[in-house]
Amino acid sequence: MNPIRSVKEEFCEIVANGLGISKDVIFKTLEYPPREELGDISLPLPSLKLNVRTEVTFSHGKLIKEVRKTGIYVNAFVDEKELFKLLFTEMQDDYGVEKTENPKRIVVEHTSANPIHPLHIGHLRNSILGDTISRMLKIRGHDVNRRFYVNDAGRQVAILTLGYILLGEPEPSPKVDHWFGLIYSITNVIIEIRELKEELKKDLDPDTYKDKINRLDELVATAQSLRERNPEFFDKLADAINSIPDVESEIQKIIKSYEKGDDPKIKQIVRKIVNLNLDGFRESLDKLEISFDVYDYESELLWSGMVDEILSKAFQIAKDYKGTKALELEDINEKIKEILNIPKGLKLPPLVLTRSDGTSLYTTRDIAYTVKKFSDFKADTVINVIAEQQSIPQMQLRASLYLLGYERLAQNLVHYSYGMVNLQGMRMSGRLGRFISLDDVIEKVSEVAKKKIEEKSGDITNLRDIVNSAIRYAILSVASNKPVTFNINNIVDFEQNSGPYLQYTYARAYNILAKNQDEIKLTDADLSDLIGDKRRLLLLIARFPETFNKAIDELRPEDLIDFLRRTADVFNRWYNFERVLQEPDYRKRITRLFIVKGIERVLYNGLNALGIKPLSKM
């Protein structure tokens, strides 16, 4: 059911009859006027390349009560009485949800954080965006597969493994990802200090020497801070690392051994570390109702031979590049670039296939993993939720797939890009253990939310759902291509522009209906009462399916958030000035109850799609 589509179709028919133009052409150019006094639907005549001075008389219809030509626009006014009858004659519980006529099998890969320390606020946006678009696509009728890429064969995991072995493989303590994160940060900072001290022994120019001294001072300060958190671990690791003649050689041994899978002991230790960290991730993400269908291990790609297969194909068309092999991407045809969503005129750098020692790079593994995602799920589309800093590597990936003969995959691989998350007054570095973890964020938001709930004598049993809504709204309300500044004190506001505000508004609508004792019959409604904010709410309810499905199809949850917020604002303004259950006029009361019913459905289905739980009490 899509009431506003019915309105638009009738308007198109009226205008088509008046101007002698195809209804389909008109439909595509319709707009909503910036001010309600201008009309409810608008057609800009210049978009049809018509003479704007042409005088035409338009008729009206069942849903359209008046059509006016104002300047270069033809504006229509909806008959609110007929719209009310159309809307509430057919409204079902799933109002707004329209299953797509073209269902697809879609893989959404998101989060995919290195399993070396807890998830932090930098991962938060990725996780929430990935989970939300997965939810929205499922509601639309697509078959969605959520995947997490486990980067267990990289240098950072090798550094953590070295530290854990040097400590004697102690039993982890809760919360396990925080515990391993500390070991990783300590190990890494000790190695960096040692390497920097060696560099300072070289003959350096004054500026370079000064920069390295400043960097050393920063690392030493970080080391002191880390030592305060666990002096025993720090001192033991410092002694062990500084007694190793060549630390880099030890790290490379772990990397190469694990890549080959030929040392059962290394294999067992790395998998233990990685899987325990993933348990920590799952525990954190569960607080936000986020989960995955599949965890794909990078090591499995290597051991299965998939990466070697890709390399074998790539070497056939690769060129020599700085002592190794690379795919030349600079001169790709502009038509192919357009197909692959690569900006015109952009010269992509070569995609290097291997290190100088012949071992594969993450770029080559990404090609193999993309093939796996498509083949495992028989996917029509794969969506990679990855930060905007990875735009060039993602373009290289699509271009490389195309050159290697995977044209369909390249054309259906989507980079869902997003800007970074900034935490006011905090500079983050995962390597140095300087970050706000996802658990810290949830805890801090919980503290603020709990205080506000208690101030209102609210229901504390809903705390987890309120925290989830506050965090999700803060992330989703900003367009993905813009940065988010995360202010914990501002995201829990029951009065305006927040997840809890939308939940509070839903609870208000729900409880009006729950307390009602009247039988709500359409024939009893007073349609003359559809004025002011009630008319505005009626139009918003009618527009919900269009906004809802467009936001899903365009992967723009921020548009749905904005619509729900505007709807909640109008509803609360109306309810603060006009009673519903206390209205003595029975027919007016019925009309208002229908409006509340529509708002309750809009908020319920909209919030549910965003992963925000609609609450019946706050």
Curated annotation (Swiss-Prot):
Location of the motif 'HIGH' region: 113-123
One Pfam assignment: DALR_1
Catalyzed reactions per annotation: tRNA(Arg) + L-arginine + ATP = L-arginyl-tRNA(Arg) + AMP + diphosphate
GO terms under cellular component: cytoplasm
Protein keywords: Aminoacyl-tRNA synthetase, ATP-binding, Cytoplasm, Ligase, Nucleotide-binding, Protein biosynthesis
A GO term, aspect molecular function: ATP binding
Localization per record: Cytoplasm
SUPFAM superfamilies named among the record's database cross-references: Anticodon-binding domain of a subclass of class I aminoacyl-tRNA synthetases, Arginyl-tRNA synthetase (ArgRS), N-terminal 'additional' domain, Nucleotidylyl transferase
UniProt cross-references to Gene3D superfamilies, sorted A to Z: Arginyl tRNA synthetase N-terminal domain (3.30.1360.70), HUPs (3.40.50.620), Isoleucyl-tRNA Synthetase, Domain 1 (1.10.730.10)
GO biological process: arginyl-tRNA aminoacylation
EC numbers: 6.1.1.19
Enzyme class: ligase
InterPro entries reported for this sequence: Arg-tRNA-ligase, Arg-tRNA-synth_N_sf, ArgRS_core, DALR_anticod-bd, Rossmann-like_a/b/a_fold, tRNAsynth_Ia_anticodon-bd
Entry's family note: Belongs to the class-I aminoacyl-tRNA synthetase family.
UniProt protein name: Arginine--tRNA ligase
Organism of provenance: Sulfolobus acidocaldarius (strain ATCC 33909 / DSM 639 / JCM 8929 / NBRC 15157 / NCIMB 11770)
Gene for this chain: argS
